[in-house]
């Protein structure tokens, strides 16, 4: 991720929810992959305005770290939902930050913005305790093809195939338990 991405998300934070229909659908789908017995300590990468955060806050956890590159996105989230005392905000680029050890890392529609997803997965793995979990969703190469075609634009994000993501996961030393393609 870079400063341009942060600036764009910050600039449009106040209207993000009106335009994030797909991200909200993805958040609902991703919530179905959360474990029955929720881990105690969770890190959400790219919490944004809280589309997936709301699902995490419905679960019994002891500590949740909410990260986003845009402080304005987090401000919008705080206006929508009260954050519990066991939550902690971490503003900054997840590719560059150091995090505490956690039991689970989540990310909804975020990893496509990483400059180097493979390296980022490796780094994030180092913050997951043994037997911990990484639960994430991302866009693929066919995501929004009609819209991109009509607008005549290429995606500013890295849109990798399922096979590429599977390879990144394996190369990072993670084990893929479940994968779903829409």
Describe these PLM feature segments.
Residues 118-133:
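A short glycine-rich, Lys/Arg-flanked "PGG" loop and its adjoining helix->strand segment in the class I
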Residues 104-116:
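A short SAM/SAH-binding and catalytic strip from SAM-dependent methyltransferases
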Residues 1-37, 51-55, 73:
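Conserved class I S-adenosyl-L-methionine
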Residues 95-105:
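A short acidic, Gly/Pro-enriched loop at the edge of an enzyme's catalytic core
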